[in-house]
Every structure is written in structure tokens, then in C-alpha cells.
Amino acid sequence: MAKILTVFNQKGGCGKTMTAMQLAGTCAMRGYSTLVVDMDSQGTALVWSTVKPDPQLRLKATGFPAKVESFAPLGRGMVRPVADLAPLYDLIIIDTPPAVASEAPWAALQISDLALIPFVPTAADMWAKEARVLARKAMEQNPDIKGVHHLPSMVRRGNTIAGVLDQFKSDPEVSLLNSTVSLLNAYLDSQMLGLCVGQLSSSSTAAKEMSALSDEVLTLLGLAKSVAVKRKGKR
């Protein structure tokens, strides 16, 4: 039975789809049967998964490693179809549109085991307040959810960003993941090829970030213990 993870935020432009797809691709590469449910009407995740690398590039990877389906037209009605698919996968990641313009995120949270809120760490005071509100509302939608965690996304280097993250870490009402997702060209490059960063290079900074994020998320979901089993089964 799949564990269900919802990636959401009140706004757009914070790396929700990038997070959902890179995380899904990384977990799929580890042997987890993974489905991405694209709830955004723009269909970015679905389009991403249909792109095939140019054969002239001679890449080993020929396509995105996780399954992607769009349930965007269903809106709040996506709950039952997703629940019906749960027995077929190890992990289902729901990529949602901005919550300010859609009820889909709140519907997805009702069947989720865990939620991630990617955010761009710029204005600490503004984000801290919004982070608390989003986390509380998510818990209201599903009191049984294992956790609602914030993921620093599109992170740039610098003392200002470090200061913002330090403020978040000291806030007892905000659950901040240890992992971060930096603003790196590798993420966009892999998207343009219809792949995830781990398929291009397992040693790149981006691939290492996604590996760390996968470790953290799988542990929170209670799936990490099966990593060794999954890998052993693929030998």
C-alpha cells in the first residue's frame, strides 16, 4: 500500500513541481514503485514525463523513471481515484497547484501521510507567519497526517539566506527539513531532457541534494527500512 505525500504551497513559483518530480524520480531510481499525480491544470509534471532525450546525446537514460498521471480535471474528486491506486505503488506524490486558487491541495491532504511545503527563503518574518498558517490548516484537513514539513527551495548562497534559515530553525511552530534544494542549472537541465538529476550524474551537487531529501522523506514515511531490500532485489 502506497504512502502518499502531498507537495503544496499557498503560492506558485516556489519549486513545487520541481520538488515533486525530482523526488519521485530519485525514489523510482532506488527501486520504489512511484506515481506522481499532477493536479495542476498547466500539466507541467505530465509534460516533463513525456519528453524524451535526443538520441544524439547518447545518454543511458531514455525516459523519466516514475509514472506520472494527470488528475487535474477531477479537482476535489481526485481523492477516490488516488486512493484506488494506492495498492499498486510504494509511493504516491501529489503535485498541487497554488492553494490560493484551488481546492485540490486541501483534498489531497485528506488522504496524505505526509506534506511538504517548498518555500523560497527570502523574507523570514513574512514566511514564518504564512508557514504556521499553512501547517495548521493542513493539520485541520487531516489530523492523522504524520507531519507537515517546510523545505527550503531555490536556495542561493549567502549570509542573508543563512540568517533566514536560522530564524526558521529557531521557530518551534515551523518544522523545517534538514534538506535543502539549491538554485542549480542541473535541475532545469534534467527537466528539459525529461529526466531527473540522478539520471544525468549521481555525483552532481543536485543529485546529492535529492538523495539527501529522499533519505529524509522516506524515513519520515517509514519507507527507509525497505531501501536495502529494494536495491537487493534489483541486483
Language model features with spans:
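Anionic-ligand binding region
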Residues: 115-117, 124-155, 161-168
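Inter-motif core of Ras-like GTPase G domains
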Residues: 103-123
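Short, hydrophobic alpha-helical segments
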Residues: 214-225
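Beta-strand-loop-alpha "switch" segments that mediate conformational coupling across diverse proteins
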Residues: 154-157, 166-198
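P-loop/Walker-type NTP enzyme "switch/lid" segment
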Residues: 4-10, 14, 21, 25-102, ...
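Conserved nucleotide-binding/hydrolysis micro-motifs of P-loop NTPases
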Residues: 41-43, 122-123, 155-158, 186
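Inter-lobe coupling/hinge region of RecA-like P-loop helicase motors
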Residues: 188-214
